[in-house]
A protein has these predicted regions:
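Short alpha-helical
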Residues: 12-13, 75-76, 107, 191
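Phosphate-bearing ligand-interacting subdomains
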Residues: 39-101
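Small/polar loops that bind or transfer phosphate-bearing groups
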Residues: 9, 68-72, 176
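Cofactor-binding loop segments of dinucleotide-utilizing enzymes, especially the Rossmann-like FAD-
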Residues: 10, 33-34, 72, 97, ...
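Hydrophobic, well-ordered beta-alpha structural blocks that scaffold small-molecule cofactor pockets
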Residues: 1-52, 56-59
Length: 210
């Protein structure tokens, strides 16, 4: 990556993306954020120049700058990513921390946040706009569809499939071969030994619906 990056979102996910880019000596041009209180202020020495629809900066995309979408809300990330594709014909780059590990035989889509210490092993597949927290592990042949979030230290074992929009909490373990449904939620520290239905929330060891 040679172009500077504009980060859409200057809160927690944006700060982690900044850290990932800077760990690889990638220049971050600026933040854009819709929270007025942040605008024209610095976040970790990078200025929040305007809002996420500011054409003065978005017109640079694809020519002079790349972009990463770091909105905190999944729906907002989806909306911003669609806007970038439809109006500016660009897709977000990945923010992969220098101290993560991504196998050369893994497959990643666009706009993913892969944080420090995360591991993505051989033949794993990660879709678009996923958030892989620090020290989270995606083992061989596991599949994460778009917009999946893994908390810090989550363990996704071999052959697991996690559908779009699902959330796996901090330190949770998903046992090999399990399927997690669309928009399901797995609580922190849970051990998932059976499939989880779409939109279901599970907690505990073994994980059970709540």
């Amino acid at each position: 990556m040679q172009n500077p990056v504009i980060i859409l979102g200057a809160q927690e996910l944006g700060i982690l993306a900044l850290d990932a880019f800077q760990s690889n000596d990638v220049v971050v041009y600026c933040f854009l954020d819709d929270q007025v209180a942040l605008q024209q202020k610095e976040v970790n020495d990078i200025t929040v120049m305007g809002n996420t629809e500011d054409e003065n900066f978005l017109k640079l995309l694809g020519k002079k700058c790349d972009v990463f979408v770091a909105a905190e809300d999944t729906a907002a990330r989806k909306s911003l990513t669609k806007m970038l594709k439809d109006e500016y014909k660009v897709v977000p780059v990945n923010a992969i921390h220098k101290f993560s590990y991504v196998s050369e035989h893994a497959w990643l889509g666009h706009g993913n946040s892969v944080q420090a210490g995360a591991v993505i092993n051989s033949n794993a597949k990660v879709g678009d706009s996923c958030v892989i927290g620090p020290r989270a592990v995606i083992d061989a042949n596991a599949v994460l569809e778009d917009h999946v979030q893994l908390g810090a230290g989550a363990m996704v074992n071999a052959g697991v499939t996690i559908a779009e929009g699902a959330f796996i909490g901090t330190g949770a373990v998903v046992v090999s071969g399990v399927k997690i449904g669309k928009n399901a939620r797995v609580g922190a520290g849970a051990v998932v030994v059976a499939d989880v239905a779409a939109k279901q929330t599970v907690f505990g060891n073994p994980a059970k619906p709540v």
